[in-house]
């Protein structure tokens, strides 16, 4: 089950050897807009590990003068050529499709209300998806891509209910494809979410950090400094282990703090 959870945040290409150099025309910076943020954080709202890492990043923001540009990577788009029935456990097609629909709304929110709206929307989405037990009858991840699920979340985020119209707007998918390709051009194509770029637009980027629980306020900054230290070394590429605990989130059965 845990392997299936982790696969949910990955591209199916992650089972293959690393692809090496980026494809021509999609190198770092080719599609990036100018940003003065300290990091670019690429997320899909249905990935539990991206949510845990984003919560950690927000704790760091609260203790330091630290800016984040919340950007998009769609698990459904980066797996668009994949046979979901063979590559993923049952139900992940619906879940990833819901993530794509929610990212359309995030893209519309950014276009109309700016980056702060994306930050507020992602915070509200993650809290609704992961920080409370799953509602009976809503175990199907596809429910998260519906107006019934989204409209109360928009209200909690202080955003107009009309943004829910973007759920169906496939015209936004080109923007999401470009930004997903931008993220993978920074790391290689054998990863998933989250992807973090330090000191954009020219700084190094990595898939992760993948952690299974949110650090405490006291742990957040020292742990982050360790990650930044690794990222500062130009030869650093990967630090990984396959053994991990389930995400410590209420949606996965963890007790409330």
Annotate the PLM regions.
Residues 35-56:
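Local sequence-structure signature of Cys/Sec-based thiol-disulfide redox active-site neighborhoods
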Residues 22-33:
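Short, Lys/Arg-enriched N-terminal segments with co-localized hydrophobic residues
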Residues 3, 9-23:
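Low-acidity, Ser/Thr- and Arg-rich intrinsically disordered low-complexity segments
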Residues 51-150, 226-230, 238-241, 248-250:
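Structural alpha/beta surface segment adjacent to cysteine/selenocysteine redox centers
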Residues 56-60, 135-257:
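C-terminal cap of thioredoxin/glutaredoxin-like
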């Amino acid at each position: 089950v845990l392997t299936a959870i982790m696969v949910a945040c990955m591209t199916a290409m992650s089972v293959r050897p690393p692809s090496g150099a980026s494809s021509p025309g999609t190198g770092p910076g080719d599609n990036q807009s100018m940003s003065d943020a300290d990091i670019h954080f690429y997320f899909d709202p249905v990935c539990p590990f991206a949510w845990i890492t984003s919560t950690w990043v927000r704790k760091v923001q609260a203790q330091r003068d630290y800016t984040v540009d919340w950007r998009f990577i769609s698990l459904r788009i980066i797996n668009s050529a994949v046979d979901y029935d063979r590559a993923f456990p049952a139900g992940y097609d619906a879940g990833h499709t819901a993530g794509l629909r929610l990212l359309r709304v995030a893209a519309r929110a950014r276009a109309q209300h700016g980056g702060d709206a994306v930050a507020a929307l992602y915070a509200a989405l993650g809290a609704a998806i992961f920080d409370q037990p799953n509602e009976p009858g809503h175990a199907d991840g596809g429910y998260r891509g519906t107006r019934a699920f989204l409209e109360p979340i928009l209200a909690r985020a202080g955003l107009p209910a009309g943004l829910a119209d973007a759920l169906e707007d496939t015209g936004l998918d080109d923007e999401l494809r470009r930004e997903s390709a931008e993220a993978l051009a920074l790391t290689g194509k054998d990863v998933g979410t989250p992807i973090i770029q330090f000191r954009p637009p020219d700084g190094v980027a990595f898939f992760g950090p993948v952690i299974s629980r949110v650090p405490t306020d006291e742990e957040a900054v020292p742990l982050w400094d360790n990650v930044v230290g690794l990222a500062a070394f130009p030869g650093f590429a990967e630090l990984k282990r396959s053994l991990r605990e389930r995400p410590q989130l209420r949606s996965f059965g963890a007790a409330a703090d």
